[in-house]
């Protein structure tokens, strides 16, 4: 008798990805975040779909439609806050997922890593456009400031910005196209995530020791399905706590004021998950230089595999690199804090110092430390 699970064309793909997948026996809870990101994406698509049923992408009614969702639609407030805080959970999982990749040397799996960087950019673009949709003060001015950065591109900058705006300022055409793009991008992200998994399953997962585990693997189900389910329960617990008890904790009060092009908020800032990049952008006095630094702050991940001279893949047994990794984490937290502060001293100088440290660690200090560690181990 043939086993349907192993022979059916569709079931076979699911079976080889989530059931009979040979997995290293020693991967820790930090490997849970891939499945949690899948769960976050699912939550965002479902809640987003229900929100789109009631939302109107028009400058005159967008703000009122969000108010209508929260006040008049059955459990509309729950869906809205699940979607808003779900984005925060998404980025929290993303940052831990990337951090785990850096710590354990998962960037050695080049195709998987590069698709991951594309995913990161796509999710950031989607989140930015989603923040514009409620059409509050911070939505409008955030959109104005960030899209206006493209005007720093020599020669074509101004034309490019006006083309994106659909006019001479952020307005109805901008909101309409942002809604269309915000709706379609999660499906593109889903496709990229599948390619990400495809490449991962070509090579197999990395593990905390960074050694080949081909001689000793266990099936994904029931071991890691159970483990992932526990992670999912904890994620839902955190998301529901945030949504039901502190729904506005991570939001900006300015976004409860309808967008007004004639009144600039005293301090324009994006959501918390973009603050580190925003701080790097602001720390450079030159506009074009700031934009380049902003893009490089993420794109630098793409050159990490070529800046890694260590003979050991993971940082598990490299205390100097471990120390620098946690310095990098502290630096990113500092940048996040600075991004939310006004542009005045001492915040300017702290931001500039933290930005220099960020790039120095990534490009120079960490690779040099790898060479020192190799030398100490006489490799």
Curated annotation (Swiss-Prot):
Cofactor names: heme b
One Pfam family linked to the record: Cytochrom_B_C
Subcellular location, principal: mitochondrion
Cofactor binding summary note: Binds 2 heme b groups non-covalently.
GO BP, sorted A to Z: mitochondrial electron transport, ubiquinol to cytochrome c
Topology relative to the membrane: Multi-pass membrane protein
PROSITE patterns linked: CYTB_CTER, CYTB_NTER
SUPFAM superfamilies according to UniProt: a domain/subunit of cytochrome bc1 complex (Ubiquinol-cytochrome c reductase), Transmembrane di-heme cytochromes
Cellular localisation: Mitochondrion inner membrane
Molecular function GO labels: metal ion binding; ubiquinol-cytochrome-c reductase activity
Binding annotation for heme b b566: 97, 196
Annotated binding of a ubiquinone, by residue: 201
Keywords annotated in UniProt: Electron transport, Heme, Iron, Membrane, Metal-binding, Mitochondrion, Mitochondrion inner membrane, Respiratory chain, Transmembrane, Transmembrane helix, Transport, Ubiquinone
Residues the entry annotates as binding heme b b562: 83, 182
Similarity remark: Belongs to the cytochrome b family.
Function as written in the Swiss-Prot or TrEMBL entry: Component of the ubiquinol-cytochrome c reductase complex (complex III or cytochrome b-c1 complex) that is part of the mitochondrial respiratory chain. The b-c1 complex mediates electron transfer from ubiquinol to cytochrome c. Contributes to the generation of a proton gradient across the mitochondrial membrane that is then used for ATP synthesis.
Subunit-level organization: The cytochrome bc1 complex contains 11 subunits: 3 respiratory subunits (MT-CYB, CYC1 and UQCRFS1), 2 core proteins (UQCRC1 and UQCRC2) and 6 low-molecular weight proteins (UQCRH/QCR6, UQCRB/QCR7, UQCRQ/QCR8, UQCR10/QCR9, UQCR11/QCR10 and a cleavage product of UQCRFS1). This cytochrome bc1 complex then forms a dimer.
Other remarks on this protein: Heme 1 (or BL or b562) is low-potential and absorbs at about 562 nm, and heme 2 (or BH or b566) is high-potential and absorbs at about 566 nm.
Protein's recorded name: Cytochrome b
Source organism of the structure: Lepilemur randrianasoloi
Lineage: Eukaryota, Metazoa, Chordata, Craniata, Vertebrata
